[in-house]
Amino acid sequence: MQDTLITATVNNCNINNNNNNNNNNNNNNNSKNSKNFNTSDLYNSVSDYKVESITEFQINQINMEQQSTKKRSASTLSAPPSTSSSGEEDNIINKNNKNNNNNNNSTNNNNSSKKKKRISNETNDDDKPKRPRKNEAVCTFCEKPGELLMCDGLCLRSFHISCLKARNLYNPSSSSISPVTTIDGTVRWECNDCVSSQNSCFSCKKRGIIGIDLMKCKVHQCGKFYHYKCVADYKLAKLINTKTPRFNCPLHYCSVCEVSGDGKQSVHCFRCPTAYHVICMQPGVKMLTKTRETRKTGLVLCPKHIGEQNPHDHDQIHNHTHTHTHTSQSNISSTSSSSVPSLIISSTSAIGSINTSGEIFQSSPPSSLTRKSSIPTSIITKSINNNNNNNNNNNNNNNNNLNINNNLNINNNNNNNNNFKPIQNNIESNINPLHYLMYSTSPITSPTTLSIPTSPLSSPSYSPNYTANFKPNSFDVNQQQQQQQQQQQPIKIPKYINNFNAIKNQQKLLNTNNNTNNNIYNNINNSYNRNNQNNNLNINNINNNNNNNNDGEYDDLYDDISQYASSLMSIKDQTVSVSSFSSPSSSSSSSSRENSFSSNINNINNKTDESTIIIPESFEKMHNSDRVACLKKSLQQQMQQQQQQQQQEQLVVQPKKLDEGKLIEQFFQFSKSKNFHSQNCKNSFTPY
C-alpha cells in the first residue's frame, strides 16, 4: 500500500514538472521549486510520510494541474491502476489539496501584484507612486498662518479669503474662481493665476505665461516657476538635458553645504530661492512655520529679507482703488473702539468728502446729526494730523488723530517729504472741514462741489481754485513769520561776487579763446551746473549770516571749492598745458601764453579793487588736500577784509547766477602755467 502511494506521488510530481515548464509566466515561485525537486529526497522521507503533512511544493503542483484540464486527464490515464484502499487514500489527498488551494490562491495573487508594481517602478519613471502634494502653510500675501484657502492648481499656494477680497482676486459669483466639483465628487478650487495659466518668476518676480515664458520646477511637490535664464544663473539649480527644458530649482539644495535636501530636515525661504538644512541654518533666520506638520518643509525668511517690507503690501498700496465709501467707514467706526471722540454737528453744517483728486463734495446732512453740540463752538479748537506711515497700516497707511487746540490747523506729515506750507484758519466760513475729513455715517447721494470763499493774498496755500489738495507740511506760525521777514530783507553778497559784468566779459573771452582745452572746460561747467541749486542756497546762507559770527560762515562754499579743486587736480598730468586765457595760435609758444595771461589779469585788476590771494612758495609741492586748505585760509583772509568793507558800504545787490567754478579754474590754471613757476612771477593772484 505504501509502495503504490509512493509511485502515485512520484508520477504526479513528474507530470507537474512538465506543466511548470509551459506556464512559467503564471507563477515564478513554482518553476524555481520544480527545478530543485529531487525524487531521492522523497524516497528518503517515505518512512515519515503522512497524508496530513503535504509540502507546499505538492500544493503548488496540484494547483497547476487544476488549471490545465487536458494535461490532468492525460496524467490520470498514464497513472498505474491501484487498489481500492489506495484509491480511497488518493481521494483524501485530492480533497485536502483542493482545500489548501483555495487558501493559497489569495496569497499568490497578492505576491504577483506586488511583483508587477515593482517591475513597473523600475521600468517607467512616470508610473512611480508620487507623494501627495502639500500646499504652503502660510498665506502668500500676508505671510501669516491661519484658516487658509488652498489652491488645487500647480502653484500650491494658500490664501486668506480676506486677503483675496482686499486685492480683488476672489469673486464668488465668477464661475472660473468658484469651487468646481469633478467627476469623482471631489471639490477643486484654483486661483486666478492657475486658471489663466500665468504666474510670476520666483527669482525676478516678473509675470509671464506658464509653458511659454515660465517653466515649473520638475519636483512634484514644488510649485515654483522660473524663467529659464533666471534658473541658469543659480549654480545649485540642476538642469536636465531632455527634449523639453526641465530642472530642479535651488530650493531643493542647501545653500551652505550644496547637498540635496531630500530625506533631510530642511527649510526654504518664502521670498527667494534659498534653502538650508536645519543643521546648516545661519543665524538671523526668521521662522514662519513652527508646527510639527511643517517642520520638515518649514518656511523661513533668510537674512536677506529681514527688515524688508512685504512686497505684496507694497503692491496693494499702489494697486488700491482708493474708493472708500462712507458705509464701510461708518461700520468700521461703529464696531471698533477708537480713541477719536464722536463729533456732534448742527443741521446747518455742510457734509462732504475728499476723493483722490483732491476735490471736495457736499451731501445733505443726515437726520441723525441734527442734535445740538454739547460743547460751545468758541471753546472747541481742532487740529487734524494725517500721518502717512507706510510701515504701520496696510490698507491706507493713514492715522487720523483729533486734537483740541486754539486754532484750526491741518497738518499732513509725510515721512518722505519735509516741505511745509501753512493753511490759515477758516473758522468763520460755513465749511466744517472736520466732518468731511473724518468718518461720516451716511453715503454720498448727490455730490455737489463746495464753493469755498477766497482767502487773502497773504496766505500762500489758499487760492480761488483751492481743491483741498493738502501737501505734506510741518507748519509752525513762528516759522512762517521768520520766512516772511527773510523774504523782505535785502540780500547781501560778498564783494568778490558783485562785479557781474566782469564775469560776463571774462566768459566771452573763455568761449572765444579756449579751443585747446574744450573738454576740460566742459567738464567743469557740467559739474558746476549739477550744483547750481546748492550754490544758490549757499549764497542765501552767507547773506543771512553776514551780521553774525564769522566762524563757519563759508563752510559750504569751501566744500564746493574742495570738490572743484579735486576734479581739476586729477587732470594735472595732461600733456597739453592748461591755459583758458590763451588762444590756439598762441598755445605753441610759452611767451605768448604769459603775455595773454598777464594782460587778462591786468584787465581784471582794473575792473575790481579787491585784495589779492597770497600763495606760498611751497604750494607746488603740497598735496591736493593741503592745497585746498591753503586756499581756504587765503580766502578767509580775503573774506574778512571784504566783510569790513561791506559793513561800511552796505551794498545791496540783486541775486544773480554765481560762477564759482571759473574762479577756481582761473586759480588752478594760473598755478599750472609757467608764470607760476618762474622766478620773476609775483606769488599773488587776483580773482575776478
Curated annotation (Swiss-Prot):
Residues 627-654 form a coiled coil. Residues 16-38, 74-86, 93-112, 326-339, 526-550 have a biased composition (Low complexity). Signal peptide: none annotated. It comes from the Eukaryota. The keyword Cell division does not apply. Residues 16-39, 65-133, 310-339, 381-406, 526-554, 578-605 are annotated as: Disordered. One of its GO terms (biological process) is chromatin remodeling. The keyword Zinc applies. InterPro entries: NSD_PHD, PHDvar_NSD, Zinc_finger_PHD-type_CS, Znf_FYVE_PHD, Znf_PHD, Znf_PHD-finger, Znf_RING/FYVE/PHD. Keywords: Coiled coil, Metal-binding, Repeat, Zinc, Zinc-finger. A zinc finger (PHD-type) spans 136-197, 198-260, 261-287. GO terms for molecular function: zinc ion binding. PROSITE patterns: ZF_PHD_1, ZF_PHD_2. Pfam families: PHD-1st_NSD, PHD_NSD, PHDvar_NSD. This is PHD finger-containing protein DDB_G0268158. It comes from Dictyostelium discoideum (Social amoeba).
